[in-house]
Amino acid sequence: MSPEKQHREEDEVDSVLLSASKILNSSEGVKESGCSDTEYGCIAESENQIQPQSALKVLQQQLESFQALRMQTLQNVSMVQSEISEILNKSIIEVENPQFSSEKNLVFGTRIEKDLPTENQEENLSMEKSHHFEDSKTLHSVEEKLSGDSVNSLPQSVNVPSQIHSEDTLTLRTSTDNLSSNIIIHPSENSDILKNYNNFYRFLPTAPPNVMSQADTVILDKSKITVPFLKHGFCENLDDICHSIKQMKEELQKSHDGEVALTNELQTLQTDPDVHRNGKYDMSPIHQDKMNFIKEENLDGNLNEDIKSKRISELEALVKKLLPFRETVSKFHVHFCRKCKKLSKSEMHRGKKNEKNNKEIPITGKNITDLKFHSRVPRYTLSFLDQTKHEMKDKERQPFLVKQGSIISENEKTSKVNSVTEQCVAKIQYLQNYLKESVQIQKKVMELESENLNLKSKMKPLIFTTQSLIQKVETYEKQLKNLVEEKSTIQSKLSKTEEYSKECLKEFKKIISKYNVLQGQNKTLEEKNIQLSLEKQQMMEALDQLKSKEHKTQSDMAIVNNENNRMSIEMEAMKTNILLIQDEKEMLEKKTHQLLKEKSSLGNELKESQLEIIQLKEKERLAKTEQETLLQIIETVKDEKLNLETTLQESTAARQIMEREIENIQTYQSTAEENFLQEIKNAKSEASIYKNSLSEIGKECEMLSKMVMETKTDNQILKEELKKHSQENIKFENSISRLTEDKILLENYVRSIENERDTLEFEMRHLQREYLSLSDKICNQHNDPSKTTYISRREKFHFDNYTHEDTSSPQSRPLASDLKGYFKVKDRTLKHH
C-alpha cells in the first residue's frame, strides 16, 4: 500500500472515532469531551441525540478494546525506546570513561548493586517502573541547548583547577534516571565541557575554596513532556490523563527529594570533622553498611585492564546492532502516536530530527564526543552536581578538610577498575535481554497492525449506522419543530373557541329563559294528562268487558302506534322549521333596526336642510328690503324658491309615507309573531290530546295528518311572505337611495340659486355705480356744483354703507367661481333676449 492510502485510512479512522465519541458522550449525558491540545482543537459539542442503547453499547465496547490495545502498544514502544536510548548513552559513556578520567584527572566512586540494602533496592525498582513512562522530549531539548553552547561561548580566561575529587556515595540503578532538572556546566582550561554523567558517578571538588571558578554557568531548564499514564485503565478524557501525569510527576519529585536527602546525609557523614578526627559519631546501621560497602569496593580495584578492553569492544558491537533497531522502534512509536492524535506537531518534528541525527552519527572515535551531547543525562547525577555546589560552599567555610578529600580521592582511584568490569558484564546481559524483548515487541506490533486493519473494516458499517442515526435524529428534530408550530396554532384556535363559548353561554341563557316558559306550559299539559288518565281508567274498565274484541283492537293499536311514531317524527320536523322561522324573524328584526337607523339619519339630514332653508328665507327677506329697486328679478327668484319648497314638501310627504309603511311592517311582524306563538301553543295542545286520548286515536291521527298538511302549507305561505317582505325591504332600500340622490340634487340646486343671488347683487352694485356716474355727469352739465356735490356725497355715503354691510357678511362675498358662473348666465340671458 502507498503512504497516501495509509494516511487516508488513518484519517477515516480518526473521523469515525471522533463521531463515535460524540455519540457516546451525548448518550451518557457528557456535555464536553475532547483533547486539551489547542493545535488539534478537539472540542466536542454536546448533542442531544436519541439513539438505540444496543448500538451504543456495541460501539463503546469496540472502542474501549481498540483503544486499550493501542495504549498497550504505545507503552511497550515507549519503554523500549527509552531503555535503548539509555543503554546506548551509558555504553558510550563507559567506553570513554577511562580516557575522560585520565584527561580530567577525575576519580569515580562506585558501588556494586548486589551489595545494596534491600530497602534501597525496592526503592530503585519502583523508580524504574515509574520512569519507563517518560518520553524522549527531554533529549531533544537537551540536544538543542547543548549543541548551541559551544566551547567558544564559554570564557577561557578563568583559572579553574583541573583536579576534582569525589567521594563514595549511595547511587541508584542506571535504568531509573530519565529526567534532568538542572544541568550545570563548569568550564576549565584543559577541557571543553563536562558533557555526560552516569548514575554511578558523582563529582566533588578537592581544590581549595580560594581557587573556586568565577565563570558563568550555563543552566539548562528541565523540558517536560507527558505520555499517558494508565492508573485505572483507559482514561476517557485527556483531562484525566493530564491529572494522572501530574500525580506521576509529583511522585517522581518526592522520590527525587528522598534521594537528595540521602545523599546529603552521606555527605554530612563523610565531611563531618568529628567523625574523621575523634570517631565519636554514632552511625546508624544503614550508614555503617554503606561505609563497609565503600571499603569492599576499594579492595576490588586491581583487575586486569585487558579483560576490560575486550568487554568494551563487545559493548561497541552491541551498540552498532541496536542503532537500526532503535530507528524502527521510533518509527512504530510515531505511527501509533499519529493514530491516537496525542503527539503535537512540535513533538513530531523533533522525533524526525532525532531519527535523522541517529542515522547520521556513526560510532567512531571522532564522533564519540558528539554522541555524548545527544545522550540522556540522568537526573540523580545532576542532583549530585548541585550537591557539589553546596559542598564547595561548605568547604569554603571549612578549609581544613581539603587534605582529607585528597586522601579519599587517592583511595577511590584503586576501586575504579574493578567497578567498570563488573558493570560491563551486567550491562551485556541486560542488552541481550532487551534484544529478545524487542523481537517479541515487533511481533506484537505486527499482530496489532493486522488487528487494526480488521477493526477498520468493522468500523465502516458502524460509520453508516451512525450516519443513519444522525439523519433519524434530524428528522425527529424537524418533527418536533412541526409539532411546536401545530401546538401554537391549536392554542390560537383554543383562544378563539373560548370567545365562541362565551357567546354560546349568552345564547344558552336566553334558551334557559325560554325553557322556563315552556316548563309552565308543560305543567298545564300534565294536569290535562291527569284528567285524561282518569278517563283512560274508565275506558280500561270498559275494555275489560270487551275482551272478545281485544285481539282485533291490538292489531289496530300496532298500526296506530306506527302512525304515532311517524307523527312524532313529523312534529320534530315542525319544531325544526319553527326554529328556522325564528332565526329568519331575528334577521328581519336586525334589518328593521338598520332601516330605523337609516331613517333617523335621514331625518337628521332633513332637519339640517330645513334649517338651511330657514336661513335662506331670512337672507331672502334681507335681500327684499335691500333690493326694492330690483323687484322683478326677486319675484322670479321667489317663484323658483316656491317650486323648491313644493319639491321639499313632496319629499317630506314621501318620507312620512315611508315611516308609515315601516310602522305597518313592524305591526305586521308583531302580529305574525303572536300568530306563530298561538299556532305553536295550539299544536302542542293538539299533540297532547292526540297522545292521551286512546279511544279516538284513529280519528285524531287523521286529524293530525290534516293539521300537518295545513301547517306545511302555512309554512310555505309564511316563507313566501318572508320572501315578499325581503323584496319589499330591497325596494325600500332602493327608494331610500333615490331619496338621498334627490336630496343631493336639491342641495346642488340651492347652491346654484345662491350663486345666482350673488351675481344679481354684483349687478346691482354695478348699476348703482353707473347711476352715480350718470348723475354726476348731469350735475356737471347743469352747472350746479353745490347740489351735485351734496347729492353725490349723500349717494356716495349710502353706497359705502351698503358695500360695508355686504362685505361684512361672509355669505355675500362672491367667489371667483361664482363670478365666472354669473358671467356665463348673463351671456345666456342676453342671447335669449
Curated annotation (Swiss-Prot):
The modification Phosphoserine is found at residue 609. One of its GO terms (cellular component) is cytosol. Its main location: nucleus. Residues 431-778 form a coiled coil. Keywords: Coiled coil, Nucleus, Phosphoprotein. It is found in: Nucleus. Expressed specifically in testis. Also expressed in tumors of different origins. PANTHER family: CILIA AND FLAGELLA-ASSOCIATED PROTEIN 58-RELATED, COILED-COIL DOMAIN-CONTAINING PROTEIN 110. This is Coiled-coil domain-containing protein 110. It comes from Homo sapiens (Human). The lineage of its organism: Eukaryota, Metazoa, Chordata, Craniata, Vertebrata.
